[in-house]
């Protein structure tokens, strides 16, 4: 059962407009989704904010998102606010997302953190298809719960999967399962006393492993590391006791990359 009359759907397709910047070619959405028109905070980089006009995801909510980033587009997709997963009772909420990034296109997918409330159960599956010349920044930040209420790891279960393919060949797979019933999530191999977790993947981005490591080490209150994945792409994983240090670290990395790849129009 879905809270809405139908499965919540979002479709977005972009292309290069007459002025050489990324524009929306086609879009479609059902409640609670909405899209803001693109704006251009820096040069030829477009930014589109994804809106969800709802208090958060409930039991039975199912989201189906398909994003097609056209060739040569440079796009940053952000969200409106922190995403809340409410008590799903004996059910769960889910999201299926498919992203295609075209030739010579750049996508920075930068949503706000996800907060699972007490007894929340969430399933997320993301598949990203790239070309050899595509560039990608993709991240998720997961919070231990409503930290201000000291509601830590009281959710039911959280399971997210991320698959990235380049020219139809898999280059990255992440399978995150957080289940407080079966695992002590505060142990030193998991959150180790921290409350916020960042997973950031960088594909074909102009950044060296040593540079990413230096930014992590300079970030106050952040415990993290960076490693190389297939074809020298990078994956950053970090922990903190608040969202701001992780958002700030992510923004520093993204800003450095966009300053390199964007150009004046």
From Swiss-Prot:
One GO location term (cellular component): cytoplasm
InterPro entries from the UniProt entry: UreD (IPR002669)
Signal peptide: none
Protein keywords: Chaperone, Cytoplasm, Nickel insertion
Domain of life (superkingdom): Bacteria
Primary location: cytoplasm
Location relative to the cell: Cytoplasm
Chaperone listed as a keyword: yes
UniProt keyword Cell cycle present: no
Any GO MF annotation of the entry: nickel cation binding
Assembly information from the UniProt record: UreH, UreF and UreG form a complex that acts as a GTP-hydrolysis-dependent molecular chaperone, activating the urease apoprotein by helping to assemble the nickel containing metallocenter of UreC. The UreE protein probably delivers the nickel.
UniProt family annotation: Belongs to the UreD family.
Physiological role: Required for maturation of urease via the functional incorporation of the urease nickel metallocenter.
Name of this protein: Urease accessory protein UreH
Organism: Helicobacter pylori (strain Shi470)
Higher taxonomy: Bacteria, Pseudomonadati, Campylobacterota, Epsilonproteobacteria, Campylobacterales
Gene: ureH
């Amino acid at each position: 059962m879905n809270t809405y009359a139908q499965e919540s759907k979002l479709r977005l397709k972009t292309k290069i407009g007459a002025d050489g910047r990324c524009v929306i070619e086609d879009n479609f959405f059902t409640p609670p989704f909405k899209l803001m028109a693109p704006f251009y905070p820096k040069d030829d980089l477009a930014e589109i904010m994804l809106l969800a006009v709802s208090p958060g995801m409930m039991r039975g909510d199912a989201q189906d998102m398909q994003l097609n980033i056209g060739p040569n587009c440079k796009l940053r997709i952000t969200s409106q606010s922190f995403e809340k997963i409410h008590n799903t009772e004996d059910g769960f909420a889910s999201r299926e997302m498919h992203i295609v990034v075209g030739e010579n296109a750049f996508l920075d997918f930068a949503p706000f953190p996800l907060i699972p409330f007490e007894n929340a159960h969430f399933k997320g599956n993301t598949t990203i298809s790239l070309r050899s010349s595509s560039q990608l920044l993709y991240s998720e930040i997961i919070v231990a719960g409503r930290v201000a209420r000291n509601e830590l790891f009281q959710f039911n279960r959280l399971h997210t999967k991320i698959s990235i393919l380049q020219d139809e060949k898999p280059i990255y797979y992440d399978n995150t399962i957080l289940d407080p019933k079966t695992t002590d999530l505060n142990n030193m191999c998991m959150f180790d006393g921290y409350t916020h977790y960042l997973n950031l993947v960088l594909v074909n981005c102009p950044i060296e492993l040593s540079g990413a490591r230096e930014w992590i080490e300079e970030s106050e209150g952040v415990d993290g590391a960076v490693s190389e994945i297939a074809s020298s792409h990078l994956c950053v994983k970090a922990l903190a006791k608040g969202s701001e240090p992780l958002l700030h670290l992510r923004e520093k990395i993204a800003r450095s990359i966009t300053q390199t790849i964007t150009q004046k129009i």
